[in-house]
Amino acid sequence: MNTIFTIILTITILVLSLILKDLLFEGRIKKINKLIPGPSTIPVFGNLLQINAKDFPKSVNDFYERYGKVFRLRLGSVEIVVLTGPEVIDECFNKKHREIFKERYIKFSRFLGKDYNIFSSNGDYHYVLRGILTSEITTRKLNNGRLESNKFILEMFSNLCKDNKETLVKNTPNQIRILAVKLILNFTLGIEENDETILIIVEKIKCIFEAAGLLIYSDYLPFLFPLDIKSMSKNDIISSYFFIKDFIGIKLDAIKIKYEKENELKNETTDETSSKLNNIPIIENYYKNYLDGSIHYDSILFSISDIIFAAVDSTSNGFSLLIGQLINKPEIQDKIYEEIMRNDENNNTNNISFADHTKYPYIISVMNESYRYNSSVPITEPNKTTEDVEVNGYKIAKGTMIIKNLRGTHLSKEFWGEDALEFKPERFKNQPLNQKGLFHFGAGARACPGGRFTESFTFTFLVIMLKNFKIVNPTDIPIDVEGEVGLAMQCKPFDALFIKRN
């Protein structure tokens, strides 16, 4: 009884102290940012209680519609400025203020990997980790078969459809996830796992991304950590994360033994061996950098985890949402098929590579519109200002958390006109991939380093799939293409009828 009383008394004193601090003390960041428009706050919690914990992006976008392209929030003890719109984001992250906005804001829940992974590290070390990945997904390497997309895509259709004229594919988004896991495990670890392990990994990644998209209260008020731990345990997010990390650790142990036995890095290599080294899985390149003293050992595990999580979930969900759009709008499928056939004089489409994408302008417009309409990440991981800066007439203090509102940026009528909520590829007619105004891979120095992977996967899959199949809705109910909130938007399950073309 005395213990319970002590805990209650301690919490009460802590809360009262925070209220007094909030009312009586005005820190530098708060003093500067208070002139930026935004909703009124309450002591200690700020605007935290005004946020929908299950749909943080919607809450942010609702505030944008009320307060404009630059507005202020205070969630708990954290000062936040939200930016919306192509011009504002471009100015801050790509142009005038690029250097000021390039650091990642490390939230409480990301603290574990802050010095070790691509996602949350800062400074020169971040660019070392990032550089190892980007060196492996250059356009040249992707075009030369660095990804074995075609092989895995054709295997998927062969297994699902066999020799049937029509095949009902149950839970199509899950089949896309399975394909993405197979591809990314081959790309990062150089392995082809059995189906049982693949299905477990699919479920673990899905669990992590669904739960991680929910509001984590201790990111803004650390004393609420016990509440979040209870929620995370219920959602199995912690056990799922460590399952993936341990899985990678086993593969890394095998690589360590291999290098110790063969001592490959100390021997002169023939041209043939050099060629093989250029195509080794990414985890081996991280391990080589560890042996050179460039990175920590734990950075291999954390970075490969980052790559697998991001590539599988955002890529597969984005593509599944696109399939849903194509089912709802069969006329777009027809136009894509016509373009494929115009370019397929030698009946060689199944061997297509990303190098061919410029020959398919309509497919590029469909991809651009998909990136706009179905932003895989509606609210990006936050950055922070490294010095005071003026944006859109408002002064933002050094150390402020910066959030990019991609849902509003990509779907607001203010930027895209009255038809902003329509899926309309023609708005990107004759424009290149990654058209100006799209920030689906983020922006600036911290833009997603795996963007080319997603583009290559999407283009290759789209061409092979629609060359060989027409995709039809087996019911009269349109596919739900809005997605559910997660760290990346989650495509809801749907069935699709794949009809072989002649």
UniProtKB/Swiss-Prot annotation:
It is found in: Membrane. GO terms for molecular function: heme binding; iron ion binding; monooxygenase activity; oxidoreductase activity, acting on paired donors, with incorporation or reduction of molecular oxygen. The chain crosses the membrane at residues 4-24. It is an enzyme of class 1 (oxidoreductase). The keyword Oxidoreductase applies. Pfam families: p450. The keyword Iron applies. It is a single-pass membrane protein. Its EC number is 1.14.-.-. CDD domains: CYP1_2-like. Its cofactor is heme. GO terms for cellular component: membrane. Its main location: membrane. It comes from the Eukaryota. Keywords: Heme, Iron, Membrane, Metal-binding, Monooxygenase, Oxidoreductase, Transmembrane, Transmembrane helix. Heme binds at C448. Belongs to the cytochrome P450 family. PANTHER family: CYTOCHROME P450 514A1-RELATED (PTHR24303:SF37), HEME-BINDING MONOOXYGENASE FAMILY (PTHR24303). This is Probable cytochrome P450 514A4. It comes from Dictyostelium discoideum.
